[in-house]
């Protein structure tokens, strides 16, 4: 019978199992990243580490007769120093030169090639510092103390350099994995969709014609471009259309049969369909995207790959949304008309205006149409291009963001009229505190400096708009730069009536005007998303009254219409998502800082 007291120390307590698994996962993830880095960008180099000196204690009589041994403990012929001290100083000097060169390259232009050069210099500096730390300095004396202090400095610099190397590894890992995964997702889509729509003419919808020295147009490539363009118009929630991705592929690849990789998978919204009325707006918006794609090839100081990643991930080119589709929020609509629409329609009236570059913050309760408003303003102004940045985007990663912000700013400077919307801006520009992580502080500083440095030509207006539902957590410096602060309140009674009427339009408005008015009074403190959820739940009321046999045999036109009682029953299920304390906090903030107080 084994003794349990002996086996008990080998068991891991239950409260430490989670920490142990997290530690194990982080270790495996780091090993994977290092292996991927070495396979993609590493070079097989062999560093010669100087051998350790052999130290022997000699007697006084033997030491007096022993000849000096060059390279170990004897004096060097050049400067009269022992070989160990001389080698420590030499490695420190070479490491300093490599690290200085790496910092110069790293802090320069943010292209992928320059980052690879910086990594090479960092590796050489690390090798020199590691070689210098292997040299033992055990004797006594002033020069030996200086050598030991040099080794302490090299040890601290080695740790900082390795941290920066880890950041660069993460940057390359994110970019490479995103490109590889996206390329794998895009391999079979054009071929499958081309078989379904092979009978449709491609000339009518071929709006993306990439240009470049390496582009060779072919019939199959043109058909695939046409098909993906139609798909992008049928899905309005996409952050970037597939046609813009394909036009990028023509300028960056010599094989036209393979499409360019997308930056990230897009969300599909099945509620909105492309109609004939939105077709001219879509073609105008698509022509704007194609025009900006052509300008990328003339960028100087920016890696075209990074510019394409930025435009593919955050450039919005989906179907147009107009102000008539949005109920209420008249103050926000008026402000956007003055800032975006009117300057684009009548630029001669705004020429030379010193307030061409404006920043806004839109405090909104959860469920408001905070992103639909700027998208509608760019749809009304056909010359505007809409950039949408959210906390889900890889561009706002704490490590990658500072690498992309300068390219994003330079990219916007060549576009005609650019509108940047930063969703959940409080997650990026929250108030700076003591003990904050260095990456987060660097990201905030980069954004704030970019805000100050955005200087647009009178013909090229740039507008940065931030949306948040926690405006009280914004940093004071960011709030100062956002000079117009527009509060989007919850829909009032009249707005709720319009929203309910629009939601019931597909069901031929089964409720009377008096019932809609009564329902609008009963849904006080409901947001737009709450009303949408309420209408969806009420639409299930007629189906809930049917049994399983009736559901299988009854025709769709035999199901009864939605009644007012269905909404009353759904009010017990769908409750308001915004509490009174939150609404009071928004009102207090708007009273102090809002532009429409």
Swiss-Prot record:
The keyword Hydrolase does not apply. It holds the Pfam family AAA_lid_3. Residues 91-168 form the MIT domain. One of its GO terms (biological process) is positive regulation of microtubule depolymerization. Keywords: ATP-binding, Cytoplasm, Cytoskeleton, Isomerase, Membrane, Microtubule, Nucleotide-binding. Residues 1-20, 38-597 are cytoplasmic. Gene3D superfamilies: 1.10.8.60, P-loop containing nucleotide triphosphate hydrolases, Phosphotransferase system, lactose/cellobiose-type IIA subunit. Residues 214-231 have a biased composition (Polar residues). Residues 232-252 have a biased composition (Low complexity). PROSITE patterns: AAA. It is a peripheral membrane protein. Residues 21-37 dip into the membrane without crossing it. It is an enzyme of class 5 (isomerase). One of its GO terms (cellular component) is centrosome. It catalyses: n ATP + n H2O + a microtubule = n ADP + n phosphate + (n+1) alpha/beta tubulin heterodimers. Residues 56-80, 193-289 are annotated as: Disordered. Its EC number is 5.6.1.1. It is found in: Membrane; Cytoplasm, Cytoskeleton, Microtubule organizing center, Centrosome; Cytoplasm, Cytoskeleton. Signal peptide: none annotated. GO terms for molecular function: ATP binding; ATP hydrolysis activity; microtubule binding; microtubule severing ATPase activity. Belongs to the AAA ATPase family. Spastin subfamily. Homohexamer. The homohexamer is stabilized by ATP-binding. The homohexamer may adopt a ring conformation through which microtubules pass prior to being severed. Interacts with microtubules. ATP-dependent microtubule severing protein. Microtubule severing may promote reorganization of cellular microtubule arrays and the release of microtubules from the microtubule organizing center following nucleation. This is Spastin.
């Amino acid at each position: 019978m084994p003794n349990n007291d002996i086996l008990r120390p080998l068991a891991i307590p239950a409260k430490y199992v989670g920490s142990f698994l997290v530690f194990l996962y982080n270790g495996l993830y780091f090993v994977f990243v290092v292996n991927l880095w070495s396979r993609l960008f590493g070079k097989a180099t062999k560093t010669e580490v100087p051998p350790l000196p052999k130290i022997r204690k000699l007697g006084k009589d033997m030491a007096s007769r022993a000849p000096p041994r060059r390279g170990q403990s004897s004096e060097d012929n050049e400067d009269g120093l022992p070989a160990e001290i001389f080698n420590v100083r030499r490695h420190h000097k070479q490491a300093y030169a490599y690290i200085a060169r790496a910092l110069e390259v790293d802090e320069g232009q943010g292209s992928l090639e320059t980052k690879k050069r910086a990594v090479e210099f960092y590796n050489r500096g690390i090798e020199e510092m590691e070689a210098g730390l292997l040299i033992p300095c055990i004797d006594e004396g002033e020069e030996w103390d200086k050598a030991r202090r040099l080794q302490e400095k090299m040890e601290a610099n080695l740790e900082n350099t390795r941290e920066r190397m880890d950041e660069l590894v993460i940057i390359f890992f994110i970019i490479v994995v995103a490109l590889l995964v996206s390329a794998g997702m895009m391999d079979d889509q054009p071929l499958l969709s081309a078989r379904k729509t092979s009978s449709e003419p491609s000339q009518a919808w071929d709006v993306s014609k990439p240009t470049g020295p390496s582009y060779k147009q072919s019939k199959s490539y043109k058909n695939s471009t046409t098909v993906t363009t139609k798909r992008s118009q049928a899905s309005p929630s996409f952050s970037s259309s597939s046609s813009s991705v394909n036009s990028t592929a023509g300028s960056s690849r010599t094989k036209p049969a393979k499409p360019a990789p997308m930056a990230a998978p897009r969300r599909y919204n099945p509620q909105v369909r492309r109609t004939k009325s939105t077709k001219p707006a879509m073609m105008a918006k698509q022509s704007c995207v194609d025009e900006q794609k052509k300008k990328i090839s003339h960028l100087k100081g920016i890696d075209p790959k990074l510019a394409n990643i930025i435009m593919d991930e955050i450039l919005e080119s989906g179907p147009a949304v107009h102000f008539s589709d949005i109920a209420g929020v008249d103050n926000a609509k008026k402000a956007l008309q003055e800032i975006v629409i009117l300057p684009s329609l009548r630029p001669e009236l705004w020429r030379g205006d010193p307030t061409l570059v404006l920043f806004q913050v839109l405090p909104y309760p959860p469920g408001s149409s905070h992103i639909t408003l700027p998208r509608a303003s760019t749809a009304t102004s056909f010359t505007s291009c809409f950039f949408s940045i959210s906390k889900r985007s890889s561009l706002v990663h704490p490590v990658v963001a500072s690498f992309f912000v300068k390219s994003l700013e330079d990219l916007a400077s060549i576009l005609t009229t650019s509108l940047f919307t930063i969703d959940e801006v409080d997650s990026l520009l929250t108030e700076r505190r003591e003990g904050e992580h260095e990456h987060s502080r660097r990201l905030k500083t980069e954004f704030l400096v970019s805000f100050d440095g955005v200087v647009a030509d009178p013909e090229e207006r740039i507008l940065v708009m931030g949306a948040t539902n926690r405006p009280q957590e914004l940093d004071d410096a960011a709030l100062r730069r956002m000079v117009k602060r527009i509060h989007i309140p919850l829909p009032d009674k009249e707005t709720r009536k319009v929203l309910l009427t629009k939601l019931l339009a597909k069901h031929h408005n089964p409720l009377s005007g008096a019932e809609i008015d009564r329902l609008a009074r009963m849904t006080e403190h409901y947001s737009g998303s709450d009303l949408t959820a309420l209408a969806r739940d009420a639409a299930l009321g007629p189906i809930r009254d049917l049994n399983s046999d009736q559901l299988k045999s009854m025709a769709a036109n035999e199901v009864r219409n939605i009644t007012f009682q269905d909404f009353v029953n759904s009010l017990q299920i769908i409750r308001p998502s915004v509490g009174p304390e939150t609404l009071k906090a928004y009102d207090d903030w708007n009273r102090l800082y809002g532009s429409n107080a």
